[in-house]
Amino acid sequence: MLDLIIKNGQCYIDGELKDVDVAVKDGKIHKIGEISEEAKEIINAEGKTVLPGCIDTQTHFREPGSTDTEDLHSGSRAAIAGGITSVFEMPNTNPPTSNMKEFQRKLDLAKNRMYCNYAFYFGATADNANDLASLKDLEGCCGIKLFAGSSTGNLLVAEEDDIDKVFQNASKVVAVHSEDEAILNVNKKLIKEGDVHTHPVWRSAECAISSTRRIVRIANRHKKKAHILHITTKEEIDFLSQHKGNITFEITPQHLTIYAPDCYDKLGTYAQMNPPLRDKSHYDRLWYGVRNNFNDTIGSDHAPHLKENKEKTYPNSPSGMPGVQTLMPVMLNHVNDGRLTLHQLMNLVCENPVKIFGIQNKGFIKEGFDADFTIVDMNKTIEIKNENIESKCGWTPFNGDKFKGTPTHTIIAGNIKMQEGKILGDPDGTPLKFS
């Protein structure tokens, strides 16, 4: 007997929507097509779209060190509530995930506590080059995280010689927070206390493009893969579109949905993140990049902080906002608005993450692959509210906003983990495997 059949839905297969049923057995996709066998469970997906399980390649779940704000358990609940079946989680915790002992500790903390599948970045420091050379076969390791500019945590690697050493020794993709620390320090004098509108003045477009040019130069010199996170400027879009190959890059849903000065007028320090939300000329260029398939991934940069901290006077307010639960509704709404196609979105949250990072058996609806699915209703409009946010932070920059298109089911290894907003079953996610 089969474990699960998903019937009557339109399945995203080989870049097209196909009217086929999908059978699941032992956590794998058993058969695609007409299913005559019986199953323990049947989902009637009539009127819905069955997608491969969607992957968020940039999240910060704050454990260890800041578990009042988020932890691996609560962050994973937010993920499955938003139709995300797998996450990559960041190393800027306290202590940071920058040695083998702390990496193993994080794997131990995740076991039987995370609902979704997971992998962790290994944090680069100025003096852990030997570790970076031996990560190729480390279980649950998706890549190396390099902070070239200071942000939350203390994993800064700002000097060119040290950045060079990271790439020289890298045995995995290096994902980069790309801001120029020297420019950040010079620009500090431009900060106006109490005025978050000066956040993108301090963390300027020049600060971003200067760093990104340097990262690309160093990565290419060593013939290593660099994945530039949360690109925010028109200059970077134009530059990176000419430097593909070993270089890939991400844009966040936030930077494709809200922009300055409106976001700071409306949200104040709740709109503060690094790199910042910028003006409409940058926003428009980011969309130009998406339409032309320049960017490779969409990652949420889920980086929650408690309200009491976000409401501190700028610049004492921390940078970051939640996003893993809202990534799919926000982007599906953009699909419905014609800003990008469903095919493009599937490249960004399923297929490209698999190709860039070498994730095994994910990202496609294929026989023999893992039975991870995100079922969505493209016609259902939801209002996102703070009280429905699963993150411990309890807020979202999209509070009160309506989005058309939303996940209705999150299925992992053939088990329904979220159905119509309700979280089901046990937290039994497993580490992702990489080739």
PLM feature spans:
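C-terminal cap of metal-dependent C-N hydrolases
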Residues: 9, 313, 367-433
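Divalent metal-coordination and catalytic microenvironments
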Residues: 9, 22, 27, 47, ...
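Metal-associated gating/positioning segment near the N- to mid-region
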Residues: 46-113
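Divalent metal-binding segments
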Residues: 60-69, 88-100, 120-131, 147-158, ...
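A glycine-rich helix N-cap at a beta->alpha junction
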Residues: 108-124
